[in-house]
């Protein structure tokens, strides 16, 4: 009897261990840039507006996240060419449309030109006034500048580790073309000097996207989870939490 009891206990423990493994949430790679307040990697439990929403959606859909942050052009390439890999925030545009599975928009973001002393009203005016414009390499902003006819000599694609706000403050570039909340957030951490913002010249949704080859069930679950987070007000609350205190102009 003792031997049977011992064997039974061993079997039960093995069964419980196997059950815990099989019931664990499957891990999915999530590629994000360090782009506060949209996505953050080094601020404790804070992951930024898009980061928090993406993680909440993944947890709700039954997935755990393995967060990765390679250089943004490489991140886009790896996700596009991979299988069942997630990426956020990603702007949906013509050049990217066929390369990804677009799960759902998380946030709408305005883009503008930022400078120390010149306000412009359009791409055309910016093209005539600014000699050198800093812009994130591999971003939708860089693509848009090229589509709007800016010369290569006017575009400064930022390298890894370069701080566009510092470059603008030191006069190394004339302007910075970027998302409004991100630019205000970074500038506020750097200086009290006024930052001159142009009229908003570009507005687009930021998506949670997946590899072109993506599990339809995962897409459906994540899409439903984001829809729920939008309807119950979670997305608005998270955005308000991160943008509180940022200058309006």
What label would you give each PLM region?
Residues 19-22:
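N-terminal signal peptide c-region/cleavage motif recognized by signal peptidases
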Residues 25-94, 98, 157-158, 232, ...:
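Extracytoplasmic small-molecule ligand-binding "clamshell" domains
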Residues 32-34, 108-112, 188-225, 246-249:
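Periplasmic-binding protein-like
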Residues 33-36, 43-56, 117-152, 156, ...:
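Bilobed "Venus flytrap"/periplasmic-binding protein-like clamshell domains
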Residues 51-60, 119-121, 127-132, 139, ...:
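Extended ligand-binding regions for polar small-molecule ligands
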Residues 55, 66-128, 138-141, 197-201:
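Acidic, polar ligand-binding/catalytic clefts
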Residues 64, 140-159, 227-249:
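Ligand-binding clefts/hinges and TM-proximal coupling segments of bilobed small-molecule sensing domains
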Residues 73-85, 101, 161-181, 189-190:
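Short helices/loops that flank or line small-molecule/ion binding pockets
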């Amino acid at each position: 009897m003792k031997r049977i009891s011992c064997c039974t206990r061993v079997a039960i423990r093995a069964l419980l261990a196997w059950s815990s493994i099989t019931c664990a949430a499957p891990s999915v790679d999530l590629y994000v840039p360090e782009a506060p307040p949209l996505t953050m990697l080094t601020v404790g439990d804070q992951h930024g507006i898009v980061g928090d929403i993406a993680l909440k959606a993944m947890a709700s859909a039954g997935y755990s996240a393995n967060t990765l942050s390679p250089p943004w052009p490489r991140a886009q390439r790896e996700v596009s060419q991979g299988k069942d890999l997630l990426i956020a925030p990603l702007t949906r545009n013509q050049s990217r449309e066929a390369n990804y599975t677009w799960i759902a928009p998380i946030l709408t973001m305005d883009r503008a030109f930022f400078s120390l002393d010149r306000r412009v009203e359009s791409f055309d005016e910016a093209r005539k006034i600014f000699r050198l414009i800093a812009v994130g390499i591999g971003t939708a902003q860089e693509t848009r500048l090229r589509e709007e006819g800016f010369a290569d000599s006017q575009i400064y694609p930022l390298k890894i580790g370069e701080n566009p706000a510092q470059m603008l403050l030191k006069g190394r570039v004339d302007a910075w073309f970027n998302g409004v909340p991100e630019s205000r957030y970074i500038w506020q951490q750097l200086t009290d000097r006024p930052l001159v913002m142009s009229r908003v010249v570009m507005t687009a949704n930021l998506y949670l996207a997946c590899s072109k080859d993506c599990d339809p069930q995962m897409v459906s679950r994540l899409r439903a989870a984001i829809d729920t987070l939008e309807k119950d007000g979670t997305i608005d609350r998270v955005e308000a939490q991160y943008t509180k205190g940022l200058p309006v102009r």
